[in-house]
Amino acid sequence: ESPAKATGNDRFDAEPNKNDWYETIKLNYGVNYFDNRSKHFDPIPDTWVKMTDILRYWAQKGIDGFRCDMAEMVPVEFWNYALSRLKADYPHLIFIAEVYNPAEYRNYLHQGKFDYLYDKVGLYDTLRSVVCGQSSAFAITSCWQAIDDIRSHMLNFLENHDEQRIASDFFATNPFKALPALVVSTCLSNNPFMVYAGQ
């Protein structure tokens, strides 16, 4: 088979570097990455059925929600397929997506059926830049205006497993500098705020 393995972050050769996700593999969701990412969803790829069954297994166990890491690296059509079916049987389920491309936010909310998206490249990055003295607080205005129509579906946070701890020397040297950002992040709107405690 060529390639013998593709990493989760789309590396298609046998020599991934230290920044590649060499410990992951790319599942076949019906996208041909060697043919301009052409989509082949008819018939439904077997991966869609199997992954939906895995989510259903955990829903049957009483899980109330899923955080979908790097959801945008999986076709939005799959999420529509899976989440539509799961929410029909388990309407209480909450799905949170990690999507870093703001141009795709509405697509993953409306077509993908996600309840919430991480607001990482918007509010988090802006607040961090303000806290660290790299941006003016005026930057916050354009940040929230860009997602005003979907703000209730954005999950705010000040730290998670991918980001440095606020209390670390690498963030702003002093955790108390982040208190204004905490107030903004929790009070800016009625959307949820994630308190990081291992998620």
Task: List the predicted regions and their residue ranges.
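Alpha-amylase-like alpha-glycosidases and glucanotransferases acting on alpha-linked glucans and related
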Residues: 1-65, 71, 77, 84-197
